[in-house]
Amino acid sequence: MAISETDTEFRSSDGAVIVNKSTGGTHFSTDGKLAVSIVANARRDGTSHVSIYGDAQGLLALADLLTAFASLDQESVSDKNCPNGEGVHTSLTSSTGLASSSITLNLGRLDAKGTHDQNWFLHHDAVSIVPLENAE
């Protein structure tokens, strides 16, 4: 999926708005269902894991968002929308399309724009993660 950038938004190749720059919101829209949870010590060996479950539409919407992030040329994104040293990223929450029982799911590029640092997110201030909005 190719991503195009205009002065006001990022759009996918099918014309769907992914990021509206005027509101700062990433749009995650699905008619399906998607739930994310952490299961701690499920196997009694002290390990935890993340579970992501959804119906077909919910999983396809997540796949589209992941594909959009993977396909995006971060180097061409304006510094206002993705500063040097950060990767494109966002958060999905229960108020933006996940099931009400879900935890927040942070998604983003591991490679930072400009520096290609793969540990940028470890030092990132979580307050600056772009909030999501439901697509109209």
Give the location of each predicted region.
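Positively charged, low-complexity terminal tracts
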Residues: 1-136
